[in-house]
């Protein structure tokens, strides 16, 4: 299961199920007023319930199609920011984030921290970019529910995102090499 993308070097990956859940940080933030100062327990609970329902439905479909995943890799702003917040990274250091692990308990602790702060106070949290403060609580809720519903107690965080993986795949195919994943992009000139 993944929030973002996944790329493992040196291994052939057989991608036999892909699903995008139509729920992101911004939508959850807006629906449950999570960028407000001290969001209500009702709104936080509602966000958890909505995320859990949508994640669990996708996970059931995935389980019907393929074997259980062995590793959860998180990429992008939420996952990398969680490491930066936990480790008080100021300034941000990608080398200290890449391939670092975070537990579900730590994600839940950071969620509590974010929920207890005003938006201005969230902007001042060490390790969190101010521009991410309005959506970080929602991202943390989404990631926590993905971890809970897929049975993962830990997450590996990668600085290499989905775009990086797509570039590697397209470059390999363009060079006539085997794709690092079992998926062959169709490369054609842009007109």
Q: Over which residues does each language-model region extend?
A:
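Helical "lid/coupling" subdomains associated with nucleotide-phosphate turnover
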Residues: 3-191
